[in-house]
Amino acid sequence: MDKKLLGRRINAARRERGWTSERLSEICNINATYLRQIESGAKTPSLQVFVELCEALKVSPTYLLADSLPGAESQD
């Protein structure tokens, strides 16, 4: 999994909603520093946090993970 791509997608979805990292971390009940580490690609979220992020941001897991999983290259 490409942690940096996952982090960029979480960051983009958060910004589209007009939220700060502090706001999203409050909604997901996680530490703002941990969220910033996820968004920078330094950390991978736990499954529980990943699900909470998807629900809060109203995005599918596929949106956040597409192209970051092994074998996800387009099949022409």
Could you say what each language-model-derived stretch is?
Residues 4, 15-16, 44:
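Short amphipathic helical patch at the helix-1/turn junction of helix-turn-helix
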Residues 8-27, 52:
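Short basic helix-loop element that most often maps to the first helix and adjoining turn
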Residues 10, 24, 35-38, 64:
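Conserved hydrophobic/aromatic packing and binding residues within compact polymer-binding modules
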Residues 16, 55, 63-76:
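Short, charged recognition helix plus adjacent turn
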Residues 29-44:
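Recognition helix of helix-turn-helix/homeodomain-like DNA-binding domains
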Residues 39, 49, 68:
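DNA major-groove recognition helix of helix-turn-helix
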Residues 42-55, 73:
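Short, basic-rich loop-to-helix N-cap that marks the start of a DNA-contacting helix
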